[in-house]
Amino acid sequence: MRLYLASRSPRRRELLNQIGIDFDTVVFRDGMRADSETDETPLPGEKPVAYVERVARAKAIHGLKIVEERKLPMRPVLSADTTLEFNGEIIGKPVDRADAAAILRRLSGQTHRVLTGVAINHMGHTEYVLSSSEVTFREIDDEEIRHYVMSGEPMDKAGAYGIQGRAGLFVKHLAGSFTGVMGLPVCETGELLKRLGFRPL
């Protein structure tokens, strides 16, 4: 049994492969941000937990629309959304290098929460699960931030860092799911898939 992954993220593809799930990718419009038909702008007063659920569910629904428009075989559509919460504020992907550096300076020496919501749309019904992790950074100096931003790694990632990459050097403590911080919590995703008859591994 195969599913569709509604994401451009190479990390999510890698993690699905890791747990033995067969999938095809349904991508969004070329030349635009991933998930371009999904409004990722936080609503006024929207809490981070509600935000990540809304966006993950919307991505799954939009992925299903792509499947229908292309007249592809009907299968479950999996999507995910990752965001950071710092002092109650939603922190998404940086808009440019200056923004990435500013985000990293804020996170330096602090603890933040990483929320990843996973949604699977199947037969008109959406199942959802949330992974919540706390990450503590050591103090990061300006030179380290400059070098890291120049590497380009922060630019497509919520919170301006990838824990599986060079930013692993900044992580002093992690409480939660490493793969959830990467963008797809494999334990929670596996449990969600089992409800639909998939057998990870």
Swiss-Prot record:
It comes from the Bacteria. Nucleoside triphosphate pyrophosphatase that hydrolyzes dTTP and UTP. May have a dual role in cell division arrest and in preventing the incorporation of modified nucleotides into cellular nucleic acids. The active site is at D81 (proton acceptor). The keyword Cytoplasm applies. The lineage of its organism: Bacteria, Pseudomonadati, Pseudomonadota, Betaproteobacteria, Rhodocyclales. It is found in: Cytoplasm. It comes from Dechloromonas aromatica (strain RCB). GO terms for molecular function: dTTP diphosphatase activity; UTP diphosphatase activity. This is dTTP/UTP pyrophosphatase. Transmembrane segments: none annotated.
